[in-house]
Amino acid sequence: MQPRRQRLPAPWSGPRGPRPTAPLLALLLLLAPVAAPAGSGDPDDPGQPQDAGVPRRLLQQAARAALHFFNFRSGSPSALRVLAEVQEGRAWINPKEGCKVHVVFSTERYNPESLLQEGEGRLGKCSARVFFKNQKPRPTINVTCTRLIEKKKRQQEDYLLYKQMKQLKNPLEIVSIPDNHGHIDPSLRLIWDLAFLGSSYVMWEMTTQVSHYYLAQLTSVRQWKTNDDTIDFDYTVLLHELSTQEIIPCRIHLVWYPGKPLKVKYHCQELQTPEEASGTEEGSAVVPTELSNF
């Protein structure tokens, strides 16, 4: 039996009143007149440049999509980044093709409890080109980031986390991370970070120009014993989609070993309006871990 789509609990519901559920209303919200600095037009792009200013929500949407892609491609729980601030950007709109966004933004380490060496800053900087194909998911992304954790240090941190997982006497079977009070036990932080790593692929694949997801909760985790050295586990996540305030259950299977390609398979209930029939989305991926921007 497939998990049923769930409404967001009251604490997450925001201000009272009707919420936009249709993609058109979500697009209008995204394009509200909150502007960031705009650049000049792209001479090679047939679309129309946004001369008067680019909606900040669109730049943030592009930056978050780029980070989902970047985190998944990194294959490293120690390298996870989140958006700190959008610094500048520009966009071109082609009604037939979609929207192309160039955005520059700063990032910070996803796990604020990670130990920092003296002189090591939390912030990094990224530049991304993101192409939203109208309302289709899985935007095309080219992203480069700098001022990140050194490769050697990242590998050391990943291996320490890996050893902690392998030293467990019994495979994990966990329910609800974080708990109902929003707390993540320090002993479960690695599981959460690995789940975030795999979920980044799912969130990138499901993202559109108006839909944005973040990881709300793990509702189940099951680690499997393997005959090789990999970490292999299944987990169910609840993804929060902001424009519709929907919660989407996804079952994800992840195989991880430090320095090796990350393997992800998933099966999600499709985001839909109440008038639409039920559906599912699924996919899988294996990615390289050697990236030019590390």
From Swiss-Prot:
GO molecular function term, any single one: metalloendopeptidase inhibitor activity
Tissue/organ expression: Detected in urine (at protein level).
Positions in the Lumenal compartment: 1-20
Cytoplasmic compartment residues: 43-294
Domain (Cystatin LXN-type) ranges: 38-153, 173-276
Region (Disordered): 273-294
Modifications made to the protein after synthesis: Not N-glycosylated. O-glycosylated; contains chondroitin sulfate.
Residues spanning the membrane: 21-42
Stated induction or repression of this protein's expression: By tazarotene and by all the retinoic acid receptors tested.
Subcellular location: Membrane; Secreted
Keyword Transmembrane helix in record: yes
Keywords: Glycoprotein, Membrane, Protease inhibitor, Proteoglycan, Repeat, Secreted, Signal-anchor, Transmembrane, Transmembrane helix
Sugar attachment sites: 40
InterPro entries cross-referenced by the UniProt entry: CYSTATIN_LXN (IPR049897), Cystatin_sf (IPR046350), Latexin (IPR009684), TIG1 (IPR027261)
GO biological process entries: negative regulation of cell population proliferation
Membrane association type: Single-pass type III membrane protein
Predominant localisation class: membrane
Domain of life: Eukaryota
Cellular component terms (Gene Ontology): extracellular exosome; extracellular space; membrane
Quaternary structure, from the entry: Interacts with AGBL2, KIF11 and MAPRE1.
Role description: Inhibitor of the cytoplasmic carboxypeptidase AGBL2, may regulate the alpha-tubulin tyrosination cycle.
Family (UniProt): Belongs to the protease inhibitor I47 (latexin) family.
The protein, known as: Retinoic acid receptor responder protein 1
Organism classification: Eukaryota, Metazoa, Chordata, Craniata, Vertebrata
Gene of this entry: RARRES1
